Amino acid sequence: MTLLSLDVVSVRFGGIAAVREVSLRLARGEIRGLIGPNGAGKTSLINAITRVVDIQSGSISFEGRDITALVPESICQLGIGRTFQHVELFREETVFENILTGLYRHYVYGFGAALFGLVGRAEEEARRECHGLLDAFALTQLAHARAGDLPFGIQKRVDMARALAMRPQLLLLDEPVSGMSESEANEAIATTRNIARDRGITLLIVEHNMRVMMQLAERITVMHEGRVIAEGSPAEIRSDRGVIDAYLGEETELA
């Protein structure tokens, strides 16, 4: 079943075409990779899906609903979450508090909720879920550390945990393991994949670590100069001469 549909979507910044008539289908529960050289339009495409940037033509649908004209807050409420290439944490807050903010839209508010004790129950449940994510991403010992004081790779793990705390149906990850060591990247990706599968979350992942991408993604979409130039299984993409030439050059093989 298709969860997300993009139909001939184009994004321009002045005279520059960042995304050129891209069409894409994501099935519910799929893990899709999105690759391409710098400037290929990958982040611009994610920004278009989450309505951070406007699209000049085309349409975007989520669960069969046209979301092209929605604002970012409405996109989030529908169950579309994301991380950013450059981490955007609350730097003065603790790791625990940052992850807790991911659950804000699931809290129960209002006089009736307070009267029947539902607010307290919801907060207790949220805290339990946060502790579970802290443990899953090996962040328990850093729960009370100020997020802004942490190394970039650890901040990336906090960002991924916070995004999963939103309980999204679709999660867009923009270079999630940049700044991590190889072992950290392997662990973070495995954790994200396992949680996503357990919860039925669809993943769209932009990542330059080709070895990680080839191991993680079920299908891969390749962009070059704003266009989709190939789509297929990791094995198909790995052996596609056009992809190798466009993405890495004549002398390099995909991992």
Mark where each language-model region is.
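Glycine-rich phosphate-binding loops of nucleotide-dependent enzymes
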Residues: 1-255
